[in-house]
Design a protein with these regions (language model features):
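Bacterial N-terminal signal peptides that target proteins for export
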Residues: 1-9
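A short glycine-rich, His/Asp/Glu-containing loop-to-beta-strand
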Residues: 29-56, 61-66, 119-120
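Short acidic-glycine-tyrosine-enriched beta hairpin
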Residues: 38-41, 81-99
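Histidine-centered metal-chelating micro-motifs
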Residues: 52-56, 92-95, 99-106
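Glycine- and acidic-residue-biased ligand/ion/polar-headgroup-sensing regions
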Residues: 60-80
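Ligand-binding loop in jelly-roll beta-barrel domains
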Residues: 100-125
């Protein structure tokens, strides 16, 4: 429980500084990941996902919480091309479970503006 409180405090502090960081990151022209925090319990990163620039196919071994710093529609695309749209509202958090073994996906920002998300990935099973 104490670790969860620490993570929540860290995420809240990060969200408060997001506006300042965003001013620096406005010059970004392609999708980028910015590591924020990493230990044996959680891994936290911020990603700015540019419009219509698919991320490389990848896999998530662990469950994660996505916090939409800016809202929009993120299309989750599997290797066969099937699209699962996720509509994320600014300031809201969303739970995404670990992916099944060997499953892959790509993320595509379906909007016309960059989307910023904070990802908190849990590293341990309960």
């Amino acid at each position: 429980m104490k670790q969860a409180i620490r993570v929540a405090a860290f995420v809240a502090a990060t969200l408060c500084t997001s506006v300042v960081i965003s001013q620096v990151e406005k010059k970004i022209q392609q999708t980028e990941r910015f590591p924020q925090f990493d230990n044996e319990d959680v891994k936290v990163w911020k990603t700015i996902v540019m419009p219509h620039q698919p991320l490389a196919m990848h896999h998530h071994d662990h469950p994660r919480v996505i916090i939409a710093l800016t809202g929009g529609t993120m299309n989750i695309v599997d290797p066969a091309g099937a699209v699962e749209p996720h509509i994320w509202e600014t300031g809201k958090a969303y739970w995404l479970p670990a992916m099944p073994p060997n499953a892959m996906h790509s993320d595509v920002n379906a909007g016309d503006k960059p989307m910023e998300v904070m990802v908190v990935e849990l590293q341990k099973e309960k």
